[in-house]
Amino acid sequence: MKPVFLDFEQPIAELTNKIDELRFVQDESAVDISDEIHRLQKKSNDLTKSIFSKLTPAQISQVSRHPQRPYTLDYIDALFTDFEELHGDRHFADDHAIVGGLARFNGQSVVVVGHQKGRDTKEKIRRNFGMPRPEGYRKALRLMKTAEKFGLPVMTFIDTPGAYPGIGAEERGQSEAIGKNLYELTRLRVPVLCTVIGEGGSGGALAVAVGDYVNMLQYSTYSVISPEGCASILWKTAEKAADAAQALGITADRLQKLDLVDTVIKEPLGGAHRDFGQTMKNVKAVLEKQLHEAQSIPLADLLSRRFDRIMAYGKFSEQ
């Protein structure tokens, strides 16, 4: 797959194109230009490190939405075995913006749930661009209650612009579905591990992101509203999105400092989409450690700790 570069990555794109051209020349002729290719490759890596070491919140927001980032089904394929997808909320329909089912993680049975976006136009429409309707959240809850019934840990992957705001979704109880999930997740009697892998958009993300551990990939975001949406409300123009992103505190590092996130999972140089394999290794290592910790804690203590964690949201001290 040909890499897609964001606006601020154009200097990297130019170097990458030069490297590709030189590789083509080397393949088609007897001229040895491998040293020049290596020099440009090192220059490209150094430039990428330089650019990504000083990303603004607005730029991180762009990376979190990168069209080539791994989605939930990519993580399921890489981290789990024997995945059996389950469909429908048993009330209205099957929402393809939420995927989930039974699987094995390191041989242990678990339930996995997550948002799913599409790669091409047809799939994006089918997945509703990763924006669940009420039936998606009710499907997620059905799967999590199944996990509770059989004593299976729950692992969720969050990547959504937000819950779908359509009229039909509102008529079918979008806010009720989200609120019900929040309530049930606070008292679910099994370990719950949540990982933000891309966009963590408002209540649409929170409905599957209440757990014993909340992780974020290094270049993912988590906020009550998108920077563009916030700018449109406050300044009446999306051109102020960069200012909004800064004010919202949407980045993983910022949220970890506020004790809203447990672990920031390091991404490969250039973002998760640059190296799926390394991204999966990094995520797996964190989930393995957290699952072991959660299962070593007595259930009553686990639930008490989860409740205390939620009650601590929003606390602050004046200095």
From Swiss-Prot:
GO terms for biological process: fatty acid biosynthetic process; malonyl-CoA biosynthetic process. InterPro entries: Acetyl_CoA_COase_a_su (IPR001095), ClpP/crotonase-like_dom_sf (IPR029045), COA_CT_C (IPR011763). One of its GO terms (molecular function) is carboxyl- or carbamoyltransferase activity. Its EC number is 2.1.3.15. Signal peptide: none annotated. It holds the Pfam family ACCA. Residues 39-293 form the CoA carboxyltransferase C-terminal domain. It catalyses: N(6)-carboxybiotinyl-L-lysyl-[protein] + acetyl-CoA = N(6)-biotinyl-L-lysyl-[protein] + malonyl-CoA. Keywords: ATP-binding, Cytoplasm, Fatty acid biosynthesis, Fatty acid metabolism, Lipid biosynthesis, Lipid metabolism, Nucleotide-binding, Transferase. Transmembrane segments: none annotated. Pathway: Lipid metabolism; malonyl-CoA biosynthesis; malonyl-CoA from acetyl-CoA: step 1/1. GO terms for cellular component: acetyl-CoA carboxylase complex. Its main location: cytoplasm. It is found in: Cytoplasm. It comes from the Bacteria. Belongs to the AccA family. Acetyl-CoA carboxylase is a heterohexamer composed of biotin carboxyl carrier protein (AccB), biotin carboxylase (AccC) and two subunits each of ACCase subunit alpha (AccA) and ACCase subunit beta (AccD). Component of the acetyl coenzyme A carboxylase (ACC) complex. First, biotin carboxylase catalyzes the carboxylation of biotin on its carrier protein (BCCP) and then the CO(2) group is transferred by the carboxyltransferase to acetyl-CoA to form malonyl-CoA. This is Acetyl-coenzyme A carboxylase carboxyl transferase subunit alpha.
